[in-house]
C-alpha cells in the first residue's frame, strides 16, 4: 500500500572462510486512521533531548486552514527509522525515558552515515531521547538525522 514502509536488508556475517549472507524484509502498515507518519531532518546536539517533536505529516487531504496535528509525548511509536547523515559524529538513542549518554548501557549507537530501524510497540514519544556523540566518549558536534516514524496518535 501507499502508506506502508518496506525495509529490505542483506547482511554478510562471520569471517570470510565461513561467511554467510542473510536477507530479510519487513513491511509496516498503519492499522487505522490514528496511525500517522512523522518525518523530520533533526539536528541532534551534544545535549540529551527528545528525538521526536513537532507535528505529524498530513498525508490525507486537509483544507488550507487545517493545522497539522501536534505530536504528544504519550503517543506510541510503532516503527522508527533513523539515518545519520553526518560524516563524523554518531548518536546514542535511549528508549526508556532516561537521559541519553555515551556511557548508557542500553542505548543504541548509530554511527556516521549509518541507519537503524525497529518496531517499538510499547514505547512512547516521551521515552525516546538522543544525543550526538562519538563511540566511547562525549560528542562535540551536531549530528543530522533523518527521523521517520509511524506513530499511534493516542491523544
Model regions and ranges:
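C-terminal interaction-tip segments
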Residues: 3-19, 132-155
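Intrinsic-disorder/low-complexity, polar/charged segments enriched in Ser/Thr/Lys/Arg/Asp/Glu/Gln
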Residues: 39, 77-79, 115-117
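Short, surface-exposed beta-strand/strand-loop-strand elements in extracellular ectodomains
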Residues: 74-77, 83-107
Amino acid at each position: 500500500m501507499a502508506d506502508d514502509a518496506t525495509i529490505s536488508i542483506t547482511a554478510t556475517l562471520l569471517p570470510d572462510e565461513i561467511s554467510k549472507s542473510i536477507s530479510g524484509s519487513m513491511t509496516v502498515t498503519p492499522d487505522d486512521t490514528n496511525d500517522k507518519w512523522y518525518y523530520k531532518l533533526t539536528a541532534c546536539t551534544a545535549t540529551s533531548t527528545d528525538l521526536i517533536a513537532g507535528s505529524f505529516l498530513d498525508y490525507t487531504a486537509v483544507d488550507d486552514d487545517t493545522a497539522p496535528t501536534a505530536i504528544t509525548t504519550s503517543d506510541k511509536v510503532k516503527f522508527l527509522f533513523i539515518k545519520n547523515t553526518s560524516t563524523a559524529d554518531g548518536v546514542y538513542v535511549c528508549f526508556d525515558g532516561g537521559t541519553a549518554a555515551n556511557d548508557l548501557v542500553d542505548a543504541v549507537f548509530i554511527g556516521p552515515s549509518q541507519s537503524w530501524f525497529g518496531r517499538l510497540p510499547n514505547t512512547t514519544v516521551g521515552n525516546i531521547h538522543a544525543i550526538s556523540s562519538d563511540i566511547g566518549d562525549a560528542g562535540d558536534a551536531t549530528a543530522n538525522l533523518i527521523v521517520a516514524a509511524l506513530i499511534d496518535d493516542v491523544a
